[in-house]
UniProtKB/Swiss-Prot annotation:
Residues 43-75 form a coiled coil. One of its GO terms (biological process) is regulation of DNA-templated transcription elongation. The keyword DNA-binding applies. Keywords: Coiled coil, DNA-binding, Transcription, Transcription regulation. One of its GO terms (molecular function) is RNA polymerase binding. PROSITE patterns: GREAB_1 (PS00829), GREAB_2 (PS00830). This is Transcription elongation factor GreA. Pfam families: GreA_GreB, GreA_GreB_N. Belongs to the GreA/GreB family. It comes from the Bacteria. Necessary for efficient RNA polymerase transcription elongation past template-encoded arresting sites. The arresting sites in DNA have the property of trapping a certain fraction of elongating RNA polymerases that pass through, resulting in locked ternary complexes. Cleavage of the nascent transcript by cleavage factors such as GreA or GreB allows the resumption of elongation from the new 3'terminus. GreA releases sequences of 2 to 3 nucleotides.
Amino acid sequence: MSDRIYLTKQGYNRMRDELNLLKTVVRKEVLEKIAEARAHGDLSENAEYEAAREQQAQMESKIVDLENKLTRASILDPKQIRTDRVYILTSVKLRNLDETDDEIIEYTLVSSEEADTDQGKISVRSPVGKALIGKAVGEKVQIHVPKGELHYEILEIFVK
Protein backbone atom coordinates (compact mmCIF):
# COMPACT_ATOMS: atom_id res chain seq x y z
CA MET A 1 0.00 0.00 0.00
CA SER A 2 1.56 3.29 -1.06
CA ASP A 3 -1.15 5.78 -0.06
CA ARG A 4 0.13 8.92 1.62
CA ILE A 5 -0.70 9.35 5.28
CA TYR A 6 -1.28 12.93 6.39
CA LEU A 7 -0.23 13.59 9.96
CA THR A 8 0.25 16.48 12.31
CA LYS A 9 3.80 17.03 13.55
CA GLN A 10 2.66 15.71 16.95
CA GLY A 11 1.15 12.59 15.37
CA TYR A 12 4.33 11.92 13.41
CA ASN A 13 6.48 12.37 16.51
CA ARG A 14 4.21 10.08 18.55
CA MET A 15 4.53 7.31 15.94
CA ARG A 16 8.30 7.82 15.67
CA ASP A 17 8.68 7.66 19.46
CA GLU A 18 6.59 4.48 19.64
CA LEU A 19 8.74 2.89 16.93
CA ASN A 20 11.92 3.87 18.77
CA LEU A 21 10.58 2.39 22.03
CA LEU A 22 9.66 -0.88 20.31
CA LYS A 23 13.06 -1.19 18.63
CA THR A 24 15.19 -0.28 21.63
CA VAL A 25 13.37 -1.30 24.81
CA VAL A 26 10.54 -3.70 23.99
CA ARG A 27 12.52 -5.78 21.49
CA LYS A 28 15.27 -6.31 24.08
CA GLU A 29 12.72 -7.32 26.75
CA VAL A 30 11.05 -9.82 24.43
CA LEU A 31 14.38 -11.36 23.44
CA GLU A 32 15.23 -11.74 27.13
CA LYS A 33 11.90 -13.53 27.72
CA ILE A 34 12.64 -15.90 24.83
CA ALA A 35 16.12 -16.65 26.18
CA GLU A 36 14.73 -17.25 29.66
CA ALA A 37 12.04 -19.58 28.33
CA ARG A 38 14.61 -21.47 26.25
CA ALA A 39 16.62 -22.08 29.39
CA HIS A 40 13.71 -24.09 30.81
CA GLY A 41 14.44 -26.95 28.44
CA ASP A 42 12.14 -28.75 25.99
CA LEU A 43 10.68 -26.11 23.64
CA SER A 44 8.00 -28.40 22.20
CA GLU A 45 5.86 -28.15 25.34
CA ASN A 46 7.04 -24.82 26.69
CA ALA A 47 4.05 -22.45 26.93
CA GLU A 48 6.25 -19.63 28.21
CA TYR A 49 8.44 -19.93 25.11
CA GLU A 50 5.43 -20.00 22.77
CA ALA A 51 3.95 -16.91 24.46
CA ALA A 52 7.24 -15.03 24.14
CA ARG A 53 7.54 -16.00 20.46
CA GLU A 54 3.96 -14.81 19.85
CA GLN A 55 4.76 -11.52 21.59
CA GLN A 56 7.86 -11.20 19.40
CA ALA A 57 5.83 -11.77 16.22
CA GLN A 58 3.27 -9.13 17.24
CA MET A 59 5.99 -6.65 18.14
CA GLU A 60 7.88 -7.18 14.87
CA SER A 61 4.63 -6.78 12.94
CA LYS A 62 3.96 -3.49 14.75
CA ILE A 63 7.50 -2.30 13.95
CA VAL A 64 7.03 -3.05 10.24
CA ASP A 65 3.63 -1.33 10.27
CA LEU A 66 5.00 1.82 11.94
CA GLU A 67 8.02 1.94 9.62
CA ASN A 68 5.70 1.65 6.63
CA LYS A 69 3.41 4.41 7.88
CA LEU A 70 6.29 6.75 8.71
CA THR A 71 7.75 6.18 5.24
CA ARG A 72 4.43 7.18 3.67
CA ALA A 73 3.78 10.08 6.05
CA SER A 74 3.44 13.70 5.01
CA ILE A 75 3.42 16.23 7.81
CA LEU A 76 0.77 18.89 7.34
CA ASP A 77 1.36 22.46 8.46
CA PRO A 78 -1.84 23.77 10.09
CA LYS A 79 -1.00 27.28 8.81
CA GLN A 80 -1.39 26.00 5.25
CA ILE A 81 -4.84 24.47 5.76
CA ARG A 82 -7.68 26.34 4.07
CA THR A 83 -10.90 26.90 5.97
CA ASP A 84 -13.29 27.62 3.10
CA ARG A 85 -14.31 23.95 3.16
CA VAL A 86 -13.83 20.96 5.45
CA TYR A 87 -10.44 19.31 4.86
CA ILE A 88 -8.15 17.07 6.87
CA LEU A 89 -6.93 18.94 10.00
CA THR A 90 -9.83 21.37 9.98
CA SER A 91 -12.15 21.58 12.94
CA VAL A 92 -15.87 22.00 12.44
CA LYS A 93 -18.72 23.14 14.64
CA LEU A 94 -21.96 21.39 13.78
CA ARG A 95 -25.53 21.93 14.87
CA ASN A 96 -27.40 18.69 15.42
CA LEU A 97 -30.61 19.15 13.43
CA ASP A 98 -32.15 16.04 15.00
CA GLU A 99 -32.16 17.60 18.49
CA THR A 100 -34.52 20.32 19.67
CA ASP A 101 -31.98 21.93 22.01
CA ASP A 102 -29.64 23.14 19.21
CA GLU A 103 -26.85 20.84 20.38
CA ILE A 104 -23.47 22.02 19.04
CA ILE A 105 -20.79 19.41 18.34
CA GLU A 106 -17.15 20.03 17.46
CA TYR A 107 -14.89 17.62 15.58
CA THR A 108 -11.39 17.80 14.14
CA LEU A 109 -10.82 15.69 11.04
CA VAL A 110 -7.58 13.72 11.12
CA SER A 111 -6.03 10.63 9.53
CA SER A 112 -7.11 7.20 10.76
CA GLU A 113 -3.77 6.94 12.58
CA GLU A 114 -4.52 10.00 14.74
CA ALA A 115 -8.25 9.47 15.32
CA ASP A 116 -9.30 9.66 18.98
CA THR A 117 -13.01 10.16 19.57
CA ASP A 118 -12.42 10.98 23.25
CA GLN A 119 -10.57 14.09 22.06
CA GLY A 120 -13.05 14.88 19.29
CA LYS A 121 -10.62 13.76 16.57
CA ILE A 122 -12.41 11.71 13.92
CA SER A 123 -10.98 9.97 10.90
CA VAL A 124 -11.59 11.41 7.46
CA ARG A 125 -12.45 7.80 6.54
CA SER A 126 -15.21 7.48 9.14
CA PRO A 127 -18.84 7.91 8.04
CA VAL A 128 -18.94 11.37 9.64
CA GLY A 129 -15.57 12.36 8.16
CA LYS A 130 -16.53 11.19 4.67
CA ALA A 131 -19.80 13.14 4.83
CA LEU A 132 -18.09 16.36 5.96
CA ILE A 133 -15.08 16.46 3.62
CA GLY A 134 -15.46 19.18 1.00
CA LYS A 135 -18.50 20.80 2.60
CA ALA A 136 -18.74 24.54 3.42
CA VAL A 137 -20.25 26.64 6.21
CA GLY A 138 -24.03 26.68 6.00
CA GLU A 139 -24.32 23.33 4.25
CA LYS A 140 -26.49 20.64 5.75
CA VAL A 141 -25.17 17.10 5.78
CA GLN A 142 -26.90 13.77 6.13
CA ILE A 143 -24.66 11.11 7.61
CA HIS A 144 -25.37 7.39 7.40
CA VAL A 145 -24.14 5.62 10.52
CA PRO A 146 -24.87 2.13 11.87
CA LYS A 147 -27.58 3.55 14.18
CA GLY A 148 -29.38 5.28 11.30
CA GLU A 149 -29.05 8.79 9.92
CA LEU A 150 -27.74 11.96 11.50
CA HIS A 151 -28.44 15.47 10.23
CA TYR A 152 -26.11 18.40 10.87
CA GLU A 153 -25.58 21.95 9.72
CA ILE A 154 -22.00 23.22 9.43
CA LEU A 155 -21.69 26.38 11.53
CA GLU A 156 -17.95 27.04 11.45
CA ILE A 157 -14.74 25.68 9.91
CA PHE A 158 -11.43 26.57 11.54
CA VAL A 159 -7.93 25.32 12.34
CA LYS A 160 -6.88 24.89 15.98
